[in-house]
Amino acid sequence: MKKEMTITYKVESGLYLNITNKCSNRCSFCIRNNGDGAYGSDSLWLSREPTAEEIWNAVVAANPDKYSEVVFCGYGEPSCRLDVMCEIAKRIKENYKVPVRVNTNGQSSLINGRDTAPDFSVFDCVSISLNAPTAERYQEICKSQYGERAFDAMLDFAREVKKYSPEVLLSVVKETMSEEELSACIRLCDEIGVKIKIRNYIG
């Protein structure tokens, strides 16, 4: 029987949460352009937005303590459901010992119309997709609904959120940029004072 919704799925030793299909970007390299699932999961396309209680029930059923971490990352931008995301993260922290991370495009404050960095204090790690060293290049490959201003908003978010979360990373996909662009991204991370995560393209 086909599942109505895949809310939880496993990636290596992590439990991943797929809470929305909404996203403010249309990245050219996004894994969802190439199929319905990721890492052998069932389809991550949701028939509807799951309620907070449905997400929580899926989390409990999966037993987070069996995993090395819980990660908010699916076929959408988790901060499009900021309140639900933070509620579930808080409940996980209250009931389990596992660290909680969110993978985000860093546009939460644009999406929600306010400074949302303090909301992310519930996360042990905030991993932000940098993807490019300039606003022009970022818009070229990420195609944000907010245009080129999304890039500066993302960097501002990174600067702010490091005040609230103990670990902040900016990630890049190695295959989508030149060596010069990668070097520029590394310098940008140094200027902001956060670590860079260089990951490989998953197609």
List each model region and its residues.
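A generic local structural motif
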Residues: K2-E4, W56-V59, N112-T116
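Canonical Radical SAM [4Fe-4S] cluster-binding loop centered on the CxxxCxxC motif
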Residues: K2-P50
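Flexible, charged surface loops at secondary-structure boundaries
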Residues: Y9-V11, A62-D65, F120-S121
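Short, basic/glycine-rich phosphate-binding loops at helix/coil junctions
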Residues: N34-G40, K66-V70, T134-R137
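Short Fe-S-cluster ligation motifs
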Residues: P50-Y75
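Conserved AdoMet/S-adenosylmethionine-binding subsite of the radical SAM
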Residues: Y75-G203
